[in-house]
Regions:
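Class I SAM-dependent methyltransferase SAM/SAH-binding core
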Residues: 47-88
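C-terminal lobe and adjacent flexible extensions of AdoMet/dcAdoMet transferase-like proteins
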Residues: 197, 201-240
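Conserved class I S-adenosyl-L-methionine
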Residues: 1-43
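A short SAM/SAH-binding and catalytic strip from SAM-dependent methyltransferases
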Residues: 96-112
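A short glycine-rich, Lys/Arg-flanked "PGG" loop and its adjoining helix->strand segment in the class I
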Residues: 115-127
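SAM-dependent methyltransferase
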Residues: 132-205
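A short acidic, Gly/Pro-enriched loop at the edge of an enzyme's catalytic core
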Residues: 87-97
Length: 240
C-alpha cells in the first residue's frame, strides 16, 4: 500500500478538509450514539482524524501499514495504536464508535473480505454503538480513462509530484501511482500499485446485513464518496 510513500502521505493529502469531516462525524455520533465515550479508527493512517477527535472521545487506532502507524504514534504518543489487518485484529473489547474512513474498506478486494472486515469491526462495536464506513467507488463510478493530473505537495526538505494511471479488471480497480520526489541535489522516482475492490451499493448493504448490522448510506458522506452509518441489528457480545 503506502510502503514507499508513507513519509509523503500527509503532504499529499493536505487538500483534505479534515476539520469539516470530523465535524460531520461528531454530528452523526451525537445523533446516533449521544453517550459515546470511546472511538476506534480502523485503518487510521497517520492519525489525522484521530488528532481532531481526541478532545471528544477516548481514542485508539488500528492500521496495517507500519510506516503510517509510526507517523501516527509520533503525532499522538499517548494514544494506543495497534498494528493489524481489519479482517483479523482482535483488541478483546468494544467501542462506542468504530470508524473506517477515506475508502480504506476498498482495499478489501473480494466481497468475502469486505464481510470479514465488517464482521470483525462489528465484534468491536458496543451494543448501542455506531459504525461509520466510508466506501470506495462502485463498478459504474470508477473511470479508468480519466486524464492524469499532477498532485504537487511540499514537505520538510522535499517536493513530491504524484500522478497515476488506472485500470479495471472485472471487479478490481488498480491505480499505479508514479512519484517524483525532489530533495536537495537529487530527484527520485518510484511507483506504487493500489488495488481496490469495486462493489455495488446492494452488495455492500448485503455485507453489512450478513455482519449483523443495519446500515444506511448517506450518499454525500464526508467528501462525496458516501458514508455507511451502521448499528447492530441485535445485541452483540464482546470480542474474545
Amino acid at each position: 500500500m503506502f510502503t514507499k510513500s508513507a513519509a509523503f502521505y500527509d503532504a499529499l493529502y493536505s487538500w483534505k478538509d479534515y476539520p469539516a469531516e470530523v465535524e460531520k462525524i461528531r454530528s452523526i455520533i451525537a445523533s446516533r450514539a449521544p453517550g459515546a465515550e470511546t472511538l476506534l479508527d480502523v485503518a487510521c493512517g497517520t492519525g489525522l482524524h484521530l488528532s481532531l477527535l481526541r478532545d471528544s472521545f477516548r481514542i485508539e487506532g488500528v492500521d496495517l501499514d507500519p510506516g503510517l502507524m509510526e507517523i501516527a504514534r509520533e503525532r499522538l504518543p499517548d494514544v494506543p495504536f495497534h498494528l493489524g489487518d481489519m479482517r483479523t485484529f482482535n483488541l478483546g473489547r468494544q467501542f462506542d464508535v468504530v470508524t473506517c474512513l477515506f475508502s480504506s474498506i476498498g482495499y478489501m478486494t473480494t466481497i468475502e473480505d469486505v464481510l470479514h472486515a465488517l464482521a470483525n469491526m462489528a465484534g468491536h462495536l458496543a451494543p448501542d454503538g455506531v459504525m461509520l464506513v466510508e466506501p470506495w467507488m462502485s463498478p459504474d463510478g470508477f473511470d479508468p480513462n480519466h486524464k492524469p493530473r499532477p498532485l504537487i505537495a511540499e514537505g520538510d526538505g522535499f517536493t513530491v509530484v504524484r500522478m497515476n494511471d488506472s485500470s479495471v479488471d472485472r471487479r478490481l480497480s488498480t491505480m499505479r501511482f508514479h512519484y517524483l520526489v525532489g530533495r536537495p541535489g537529487k530527484v527520485d522516482h518510484f511507483t506504487e500499485d493500489h488495488v481496490l475492490g469495486l462493489f455495488t451499493v446492494d452488495e455492500m448493504a448485503a455485507a453489512f446485513a450478513a455482519a449483523g448490522l443495519i446500515a444506511e448510506l448517506d450518499p454525500e458522506g464526508l467528501m462525496g464518496r458516501g458514508l455507511w452509518i451502521a448499528r447492530h441489528s441485535r445485541p452483540s457480545s464482546p470480542t474474545s
